[in-house]
Amino acid sequence: MSIEIANIKKSFGRTQVLNDISLDIPSGQMVALLGPSGSGKTTLLRIIAGLEHQTSGHIRFHGTDVSRLHARDRKVGFVFQHYALFRHMTVFDNIAFGLTVLPRRERPNAAAIKAKVTKLLEMVQLAHLADRYPAQLSGGQKQRVALARALAVEPQILLLDEPFGALDAQVRKELRRWLRQLHEELKFTSVFVTHDQEEATEVADRVVVMSQGNIEQADAPDQVWREPATRFVLEFMGEVNRLQGTIRGGQFHVGAHRWPLGYTPAYQGPVDLFLRPWEVDISRRTSLDSPLPVQVLEASPKGHYTQLVVQPLGWYNEPLTVVMHGDDAPQRGERLFVGLQHARLYNGDERIETRDEELALAQSA
C-alpha cells in the first residue's frame, strides 16, 4: 500500500509545525522519520494515521484520498513507544483484541482468531508467554506484543512512534534486527519515528530527515551519510568536526595555515569546514595528503579501528575527532599528521561548491 503525502501543512494556533510537506512512499517500503524534538516528525506520523488532522493538504493511500477518514477507517496499525497494552488481559488476549472488536461481518470466528494469534505469537517468538500478563513481561517482550497486536488485523500500513525509545540499548539493537527481518518477510509498508540516527539507518529503506517542520533530505541511509543535502543533515547525522576559516582569493585559510583550492570561488570570506572523523586523512608521517601536525589526547579502541581525539599543534585551537584503522593503535601523547582534503565548506547554510566536490588542499604554504 503506497502513501502519498501532498502539501501537508499543520498549525497549532499561531505555531506552524509542518510547512508544506510532500513525500511519496512506495508500497512495501520502510521509511524512518528522523529528527530532533520539535521537528514535526510525530505530528506527521499522527496525520498519516488519522489521529491528527492537517490544516491543509492531502493524504492518499494507494491513490485514494483518506484525508477525511477517521483513524479507525484507514486500516492502519499503530505501535506506541509505551506499548499501551491492556494490563488485565493476557498476552494472547491483547493480541486478539483487535480481531474481537471488528464489526460482526468482518470478525473471524473463534477458531480463526486462535489460529491467527498462535501464528503471530510464533512470529514474535512469544508463544511460551501466551498466558502471561503485561506486568510479567520485559520491555522488549511488551513491545513485541504491541507489534503483534497491530499486525493481527492485517493493516495496510504499519506506523510506529519511537517504538524502541523506552528500551535499553542492547534490547533496542535486538528488536531493530528483528523488526527488519519481519518487514522483509511480510513486506508491509511502514513508517516509524525516531531521533536515533543509528536506528533509522539500520532499519529503514529510506531516511527522511526533518527539522523545524521541513524535510531536509529523503534518501537511502548510506546516501544521507555520504552526501548530506544540507548543513543541518551534515551536523545532525553523527559526529562531525567543524573548523572555522576564511577563503581569500584561491586559498583556504585555517589558523596559521593556508592551502590553494585550485581555483578562485565566487564567494570570499569566512567559512565553516566540516569533516566526519573517518574523512580526516591521518598518518604517522607528514605527506602531501596529511601535512598538519597533531598530538593524541585520547585513544579509544573500537575493534577494527581506533577513535582518536587529537589536538592540532600550532595551526588550530580546537581538538578534532578522527579515526585510524589498523592494529597498531597510537598512544596518548604521540605525534601524528592529518589532512583535510575531503572537507565540505559552508557559508552559513549555503554549501560552497569546490572543484571535483572536494578541497584540493595541498601542502601548507
From Swiss-Prot:
Enzyme class of the recorded protein, top EC level: translocase
UniProt GO MF annotations: ABC-type sulfate transporter activity; ABC-type thiosulfate transporter activity; ATP binding; ATP hydrolysis activity
InterPro entries the UniProt entry points to: AAA+_ATPase, ABC_SmlMolc_Importer, ABC_transporter-like_ATP-bd, ABC_transporter-like_CS, Mo/tungstate-bd_C_term_dom, P-loop_NTPase, Sulph_transpt1
BP-aspect Gene Ontology terms: sulfate transmembrane transport; thiosulfate transport
Membrane topology: Peripheral membrane protein
Positions contributing to ATP binding: G35, P36, S37, G38, S39, G40, K41, T42
Protein name according to UniProt: Sulfate/thiosulfate import ATP-binding protein CysA
Species the sequence originates in: Escherichia coli (strain K12)
Lineage: Bacteria, Pseudomonadati, Pseudomonadota, Gammaproteobacteria, Enterobacterales
